[in-house]
From Swiss-Prot:
Chief localisation class: membrane
Alphabetically ordered keywords of this record: Membrane, Peroxisome, Protein transport, Signal-anchor, Transmembrane, Transmembrane helix, Transport
Name assigned to this protein: Peroxisome assembly protein 26
Transmembrane stretches, start-end: 247-263
One GO CC term, this protein: peroxisomal membrane
Gene for this chain: Pex26
Annotated family: Belongs to the peroxin-26 family.
Cytoplasmic side: 1-246
Peroxisomal side: 264-301
Organism of origin: Cricetulus griseus
Length: 301
């Protein structure tokens, strides 16, 4: 019992100091229920690995804080609840819901605590989706109330390195590095060196992509040309084989005769009759000569 009483009295001594006989006892400040819910959520997250229950506990704690007056303790508890909730969402592979989940409590990006914004930038940068957090970080950094915070310089550097440079927004990164007074000389020099390196890499990648595109176009043109030549060759082979075939020769001869008869000679005109008679006589002679070679005995009889 002695140990229990001394242990329970230790927090009271730290909070209100030693009591004197002449001083009236002062009441301890009430601890918001959200503090106990925060401890429960952290325990569920870290010890039990029950991420869904940890997230629900954070949401219940936020609801209980809606009726609490704003104080330093409440602000810290809200920030810690957001940190636990973000980690729970990330563990459940629901990291895309983090921004909307955070903004439902803080309404606007400018009101986010620096720790929460830092965690969002790191999360979306790790998942290779820095564009999702770009607008939020820009709004927070441009807010005049945030520019006086001690965390502003580190967040600006983090935003520059993890968001602007991966997105290729080199001009914005350079403007932030040069125009912001939050950077020290060492930070500014390191950031400008990183921007220069990123610009050189971007130039090399651009030239490489152009070369690959040019080679692809040349290869495509060569492929199309070879395909066209093969097609022409097949057409030429087909036409040559068709021209050399016996039925086509007969058809061509018949078509030539028809053209001579129809286009140059009108059977209705008297001038075409002698030619027609001669042509018919020629055909009869050819027929007679052919039949005489085939059937010589029959013709002699």
């Amino acid at each position: 019992m002695k140990n229990d009483s001394s242990t329970s009295a230790a927090p009271m001594k730290g909070l209100v100091g030693p009591l004197r006989s002449s001083e009236p006892a002062r009441a301890l400040p009430a601890v918001p229920p959200a503090v106990y819910l925060l401890e429960e959520a952290a325990d569920l997250l870290v010890v039990h690995l029950d991420f869904h229950a940890a997230l629900e506990t954070c949401e219940r704690a936020w609801q209980s804080l809606a009726e609490e007056p704003t104080s330093g303790t409440v602000v810290e508890v809200k920030c810690s609840l957001c940190v636990v909730g973000i980690q729970a969402l990330a563990e459940m592979n629901r990291w895309r819901e983090v921004l909307s989940w955070v903004l439902q409590y803080y309404q606007v990006p400018e009101k986010l605590p620096p720790k929460v914004l830092e965690l969002c930038i790191l999360l979306y940068s790790k998942m290779r989706e820095p564009r999702a957090v770009l607008a939020m970080a820009d709004a927070w950094l441009q807010d005049p109330d945030n520019q006086g915070l001690p965390e502003y310089g580190s967040l600006a550097e983090l935003h520059l390195l993890r968001v602007l440079l991966p997105l290729g927004r080199l001009s914005e990164a350079e403007g932030l590095a040069v125009g912001s007074a939050a950077f020290s000389e060492e930070q500014r020099e390191a950031v400008l060196q990183a921007i220069c390196t990123a610009r050189q890499q971007h130039t090399r990648e651009h030239l490489s992509s152009q070369e690959q595109q040019q080679m692809s176009q040349e290869g495509s043109f060569s492929h199309k040309l070879m395909s066209l030549l093969r097609l022409l060759r097949r057409l030429w082979d087909a036409a040559a084989s068709h021209l050399l075939s016996q039925p086509f020769k007969k058809s061509l001869l018949a078509a030539l005769i028809l053209c001579l008869l129809v286009l140059r000679f009108d059977p209705a005109t008297p001038s075409s009759l002698p030619f027609l008679y001669q042509l018919a006589h020629l055909f009869r002679r050819i027929q007679k000569a052919t039949l005489s070679r085939l059937y010589p005995l029959a013709l002699r009889d």
